């Protein structure tokens, strides 16, 4: 149910492909952001992707490594139908070598990734704090979004998620679903 809510909330938005890869391929954040189209095989009999690169940043600049976290991190991952369709659509409009890229087609910087993830965070009902200066003093304000309401600052944002999501939770959900389907996650 939470997966459906999350996907409905971000459908058509920049983090959609990232979230689909986390939920349905179980990739780590670093693997998703380092994934290039030359590692995604959409047109073969059994579509799959190969994990062979990882992203990290140095001084907010993206660095793509071929050395992964563990030996087992080098792997082939089959693509379920919903992820296959998502990736086919994304590839049609992509002008980048990277599956998830910035406007210039380059891998995301850390700041750009945080901005990408904000599309999700802003749709949660998580309490937020901000500061304003009133009569020369810094005053803290707290906002508690209400599920189903539109954001006051942006009518396109509806608070539709009553739970928090992290990139690692996407991978955890994938592994949990494999276990429920009696598939060995290794």
Please annotate each region the language model reported:
Residues 1-35, 45, 72-73:
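Basic, Lys/Arg- and aromatic-enriched nucleic-acid-binding interface segment
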Residues 3, 20-24, 33, 40, ...:
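Generic alpha-helical hydrophobic packing signal
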Residues 3, 37, 80, 84, ...:
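ATP/adenylate-binding site constellation spanning eukaryotic-like Ser/Thr protein kinases
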Residues 4-15, 25, 77, 92-99, ...:
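Short, basic (Lys/Arg/His-rich) helix/loop patches that form interaction surfaces
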Residues 9-11, 30, 43-82, 90-93, ...:
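Basic, Lys/Arg-rich DNA-contacting stretches centered on the C-terminal catalytic core
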Residues 16-19, 33, 43-44, 51, ...:
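Extended hydrophobic-aromatic, low-complexity segments
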Residues 26, 37, 54, 170:
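An acidic- and aromatic-residue-enriched active-site/binding cleft used to recognize and process polar
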Residues 39-48, 164, 183-186:
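Short, polar N-cap/turn motifs at the start of nucleic acid-interacting alpha helices
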């Amino acid at each position: 149910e939470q997966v459906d809510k999350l996907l409905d909330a971000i459908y058509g938005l920049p983090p959609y492909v990232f979230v689909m890869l986390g939920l349905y391929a179980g990739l780590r954040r670093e693997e998703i952001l380092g994934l290039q189209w030359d590692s995604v095989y959409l047109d073969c009999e059994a579509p799959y992707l190969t994990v062979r690169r990882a992203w990290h940043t140095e001084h907010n600049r993206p660095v793509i490594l071929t050395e992964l976290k563990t030996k087992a991190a080098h792997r082939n991952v089959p693509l379920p139908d919903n992820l296959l369709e998502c990736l086919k659509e994304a590839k049609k409009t992509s002008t980048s070598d990277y599956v998830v890229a910035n406007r210039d087609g380059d891998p995301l910087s850390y700041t750009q990734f945080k901005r990408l993830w904000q599309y999700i965070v802003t749709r949660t009902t998580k309490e937020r704090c901000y500061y304003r200066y009133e009569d020369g003093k810094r005053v803290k304000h707290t906002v508690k979004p209400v599920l189903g309401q539109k954001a006051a600052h942006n009518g396109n944002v509806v608070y539709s998620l009553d739970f928090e999501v992290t990139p690692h939770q996407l991978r955890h959900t994938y592994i949990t679903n494999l276990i429920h389907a009696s598939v060995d996650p290794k």
